[in-house]
Design a protein with these regions (language model features):
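Positively charged, low-complexity terminal tracts
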Residues: 1-187
């Protein structure tokens, strides 16, 4: 049986926030539309990939390349979810694959998200992508630009990334590409 599909129509609010301290943060995309509120929980890499895809779509559809500041002395965190955003949204799930589309006629972007399903086999818990997207929302170009700005600020406030392997640098950082050493996998 497939999960219900949640078509949120046009977003009134679409943004991202990080909850917790760097190294132990959770990221979410929060959406509010006339059809309800949604919290889509994502990994940092998913958020960065979505930001890059949105920026690419915006650049390709405007004919103008938008440059983003990569470094700021003291980046300010985005405001996060508004105070009146429900603590128990209508839709909430951990996101697996996402799809990004663009409606040329209305000049809007479309985000579709598929949840991860937790499956237990032989006493082990596994995450598996669902077969079909179960969430969609349209958002404007200006909302897309604001979303990318928020994601950029969030990632700048987190742990720095290794320029060689892209992994988070905190404490002892083992980088196979930098020094040829990778700690043994003891699991």
């Amino acid at each position: 049986m497939s999960a219900p599909f949640h078509d949120f129509g046009h977003a009134e609010i679409l943004d991202a926030e990080a909850i917790g301290q760097p190294g132990a943060r959770r990221f979410r995309i929060f959406v509010r539309s006339p059809r309800g509120a949604a919290s889509l929980w994502v990994e940092r890499d998913q958020l960065e990939t979505l930001m890059a895809a949105i920026e690419k779509v915006l650049a390709q559809t405007s004919g103008v390349m938008t440059l983003r500041a990569e470094a700021q002395a003291n980046p300010t965190p985005p405001p996060g979810a508004p105070d009146d955003f429900p603590s128990d949204p209508d839709v909430e799930f951990q996101v697996g694959p996402m799809q990004l589309g663009y409606d040329e006629d209305d000049e809007e972007l479309l985000l579709r998200a598929t949840p991860l399903e937790l499956i237990e086999e032989d006493g082990e818990l596994y995450a598996r992508d669902s077969d079909e997207p179960t969430f969609s929302v349209f958002f404007s170009r200006s909302q897309a630009q604001q979303f990318c700005s928020s994601v950029n600020s969030l990632t700048l406030l987190g742990r720095p990334r290794c320029p060689f392997c892209g992994g988070p640098m905190q404490g002892r950082h083992f980088c196979e590409k930098q020094n040829g050493f990778h700690p043994p996998n003891l699991n």
